[in-house]
């Protein structure tokens, strides 16, 4: 069928000599329905199947009908009957996740129906099999009519991906199936050569009031080549006006370079709350773009996405540079009450291209109501008053992976040194939700928070509440503490990378660290007394006071200089930033042993079962799963695993590199971090890179398997799950050389092949621990013997907490 004929059926008339526009193609793809004359009746004996990588789909019996062709190509079909889907991931992490969600390390599901879209040769493959099985198409209008609503509902979710291959000179075929499993319900099966991990299996599931996308497996096919980076954003020039109603009216010019030829579609991140008014090229010519097509604002908020897809008029050529201009409006500033406002869509308040390792230059001009103060990333060039507005100009002096701003009726305090300026901003009032908590005699406890302290006689100390605290009261001390943390971190990570650090308050229970700009929770600005009145437990108070602000400071190096490009590598920056925050807390309170306290908390957290599951947090999944750890089975999996186990992994590396008795026992660890922060500045740093750098710095004692390899460590502690449990049995005998200790070390809770070096200490009659030596545990039971001068009262496994484990 001629493509023009199809356009006439589904789109406004166009000239017979005109090429279809991107929107006409998209509308035509959306309008496709089943061709009633292309229906095939299948039986088991036909053995109809499709294989994509290591995924196998069998259509055993039922009906299969193709979508009507477009430009002579078939892009989909619908199947109803009985089929079987199989997948066999080889990666141990993916097997573990399959077992976590499905109860087995493979996909083995019977299904009843499937909606399938593709740009590969699936149609040709099926037609060949139909021909070999002597199957002929039949006319079945009833099947087509019954399927039309189903097809109409699902087409829009896939048509843009089909369109992308139509527009490309170098299409990367894909295959997608929405499958109705007998046991699992509806799930997705994707094989896409445009993705680094070509295979994806998963489904959306509800937990509580939230919907999560459970990724059962996502992995690369052996021998596959990752797709190249096609475009790179070089610089951003943005002019943003914050109107009196807090909405934005903004323009952005994004300067882009094509790294490869032949592509036309670019995908930008832009909040669904912002509406793109126009997208144009350098000459003002309009460019086609797609943003939550066919949805109104209310529909966008419920089922939209935060992406804007732009189509170039012609395929880009390698090394070609061009600028795309955007005009957009909407409201991403949230009102928390009591005059407290903050930026909600911090990642997508402007059209952002690329990932966390795509560094670019930024030039920001901001215009905002005169009564407010505004802070932003970059070096501040100037600020002026223009009527009822203030106008400020910021420009990056270092490459940035992202830009941000925040605003409010702030009080501020500054510290200026020879190398940097630290500005801390806070509201004079509390956000309404927190103010309500402080004004309540007994505020509802936050999750996992202890009951507020009560005074004798059963009267709550909140019975006569004092005046509400002001976050601004903490400005001076917080500025000093942040400056101290920077000085501390510079020893490990090198010079502070920015000239200015702006610290801004944000409602909620989290923090974020953008380049030169921190978003810090209001709780971190409160006194311990106010935190207690708000319902925070002692550990949460310590977290907001001693850890959260300084974790975000550490991100100035780890995340904003050393980047990550793949979700599997995000854990590294989070783990290093968090561990450095623990070290800083420990340095401020040496007698409190903060590092040990937090490591014990993290170990306990990893041992505790996830609510609604029989699994402990330590078995949710491996560190490289990143945000996949958040699922219907573990809504807070990322926080429960990344910060706790990630910190332990960095701690174990530090302990293995440590040189007790040296002038600087941490010299090797410091050298490792400094090498990484220099060598990988302003680019992506991966888990494989980390292993390589650790292997370059490793000591002979770390070489448990030979060959100067740390594969054993990364395979078990990074890509593995579980925490080893140890117990010892021993006996002693007296010899001329001293007391000989014979014993066995028992290792459980991990695979039989698990190997690690376990320090053993003798506890003598006086209660002191004396180091005997390290036992390399390479099986469930390992024998050992040591010689000591005094008979041990008992043997103790790792009392110095150098190893993530439990003991008896």
What does each of the following model-derived ranges do?
Residues 264-266, 272-283, 706-710, 721-798:
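Beta-strand-rich binding/interaction modules
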Residues 260, 464-468, 592, 630-632, ...:
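Amphipathic alpha-helical substructures
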Residues 26, 31-139, 271-342, 388, ...:
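A surface-exposed beta-strand-loop module
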Residues 488-490, 536-607, 643, 673:
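Zinc-dependent metallopeptidase catalytic helix centered on the HExxH motif
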Residues 103, 108-230, 234-238, 306-311, ...:
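Extended, low-hydrophobicity, Ser/Thr/Pro/Gly-biased non-transmembrane segments
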Residues 450-458, 574, 578-652, 680-681:
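Acidic/His/Gly-enriched intrinsically disordered linker/tail segments
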Residues 224-253, 257-264, 269-273, 353-550, ...:
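Hydrophobic helix-coil surface modules that form long, contiguous segments used
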Residues 801-808:
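Edge beta-strands of extracellular beta-sandwich domains
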């Amino acid at each position: 069928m001629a493509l023009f004929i199809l356009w006439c059926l589904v789109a406004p008339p166009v000239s017979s000599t005109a090429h279809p526009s991107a929107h006409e193609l998209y509308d035509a793809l959306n309008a496709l329905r089943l061709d009633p004359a292309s229906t095939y009746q299948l039986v088991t004996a036909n053995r109809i199947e499709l294989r994509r990588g290591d995924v196998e789909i069998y259509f055993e019996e039922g009906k299969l009908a193709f979508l009507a062709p477009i430009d002579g190509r078939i892009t989909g079909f619908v199947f109803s009957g009985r089929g079987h889907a199989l997948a066999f991931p080889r990666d141990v992490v993916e097997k573990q996740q399959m077992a976590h969600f499905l109860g087995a390390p493979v996909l083995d599901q019977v299904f009843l129906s499937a909606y399938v879209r593709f740009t590969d040769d699936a149609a040709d493959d099926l037609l060949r099999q139909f021909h070999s099985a002597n199957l002929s198409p039949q006319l079945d209008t009833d099947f087509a009519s019954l399927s039309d609503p189903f097809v109409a509902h699902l087409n829009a979710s896939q048509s843009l991906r089909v369109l992308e291959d139509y527009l490309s000179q170098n299409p990367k075929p894909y295959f997608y199936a929405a499958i109705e499993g007998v046991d699992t319900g509806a799930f997705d099966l994707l094989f896409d050569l445009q993705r680094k991990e070509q295979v994806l299996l998963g489904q959306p599931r509800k937990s509580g009031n939230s919907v999560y996308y459970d990724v059962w497996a996502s992995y690369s096919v052996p021998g596959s080549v990752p797709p190249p980076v096609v475009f790179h954003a070089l610089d951003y020039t943005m002019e943003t006006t914050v109107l009196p109603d807090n909405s934005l009216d903004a323009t952005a010019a994004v300067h882009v370079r094509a790294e490869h030829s032949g592509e036309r579609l670019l995908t930008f991140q832009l909040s669904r709350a912002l509406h793109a008014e126009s997208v144009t090229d350098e000459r003002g010519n309009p460019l086609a773009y797609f943003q939550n097509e066919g949805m109104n604002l209310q529909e966008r908020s419920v089922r939209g996405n935060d992406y804007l897809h732009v189509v170039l008029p012609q395929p880009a050529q390698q090394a070609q540079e061009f600028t795309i201009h955007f005009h957009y409006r909407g409201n991403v500033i949230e009102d928390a009450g009591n005059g407290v406002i903050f930026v909600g869509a911090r990642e997508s308040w402007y059209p952002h291209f690329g990932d966390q390792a795509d560094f670019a230059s930024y030039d920001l001009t901001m215009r905002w109501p005169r009564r407010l103060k505004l802070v932003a990333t970059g070096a501040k060039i100037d600020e002026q008053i223009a009527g009822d507005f203030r106008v400020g100009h910021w420009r990056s002096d270092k490459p940035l992976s992202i830009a941000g701003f925040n605003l409010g009726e702030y009080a501020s305090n500054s510290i200026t040194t020879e190398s940097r300026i630290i500005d801390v901003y806070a509201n004079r009032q509390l956000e309404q939700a927190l103010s309500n908590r402080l004004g309540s005699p007994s505020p509802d406890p936050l999750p996992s928070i202890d009951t507020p302290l009560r005074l004798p006689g059963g009267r709550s100390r909140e019975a006569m509440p004092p005046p509400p605290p002001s976050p601004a009261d903490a400005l001076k001390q917080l500025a000093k503490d942040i400056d101290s943390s920077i000085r501390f971190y510079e020893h490990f990570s090198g010079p502070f990378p920015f000239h200015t650090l702006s610290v801004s308050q944000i409602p909620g229970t989290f923090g974020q660290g953008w380049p030169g700009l921190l978003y810090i929770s209001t709780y971190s600005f409160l006194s311990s007394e106010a935190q207690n009145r708000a319902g925070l437990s002692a550990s949460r108070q310590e977290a907001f006071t001693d850890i959260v602000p300084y974790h975000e400071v550490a991100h100035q190096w780890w995340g904003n200089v050393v980047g990550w490009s793949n979700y599997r590598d995000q854990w590294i920056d989070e783990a290093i930033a968090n561990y450095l925050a623990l070290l800083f807390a420990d340095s401020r309170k040496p007698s409190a042993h903060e590092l040990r306290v937090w490591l014990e908390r993290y170990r306990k957290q990893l041992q505790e079962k996830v609510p609604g599951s029989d699994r402990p947090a330590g078995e949710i999944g491996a560190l490289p799963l990143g945000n996949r750890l958040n699922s219907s089975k573990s809504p807070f999996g990322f926080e429960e695993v990344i910060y706790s186990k990630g910190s332990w992994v960095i701690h174990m590396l530090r302990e293995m590199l440590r040189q007790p008795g040296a002038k600087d026992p941490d010299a090797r660890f410091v050298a490792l971090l400094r090498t990484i922060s220099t060598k990988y500045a302003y680019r992506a740093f991966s888990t494989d890179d980390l292993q390589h750098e650790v292997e370059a710095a490793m000591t002979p004692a770390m070489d448990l398997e030979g060959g100067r390899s740390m594969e054993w460590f990364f395979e078990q502690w990074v890509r593995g799950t579980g925490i080893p449990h140890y117990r010892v049995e021993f006996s002693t005998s007296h010899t001329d050389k001293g007391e000989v200790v014979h014993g066995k070390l028992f290792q459980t809770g991990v695979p039989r092949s698990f190997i690690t070096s376990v320090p053993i200490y003798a506890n003598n009659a006086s209660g002191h621990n004396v180091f005997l030596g390290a036992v390399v545990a390479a099986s469930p039971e390992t024998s050992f013997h040591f010689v000591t001068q005094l008979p041990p009262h008992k043997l103790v496994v790792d009392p110095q907490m150098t190893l993530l484990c439990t003991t008896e």
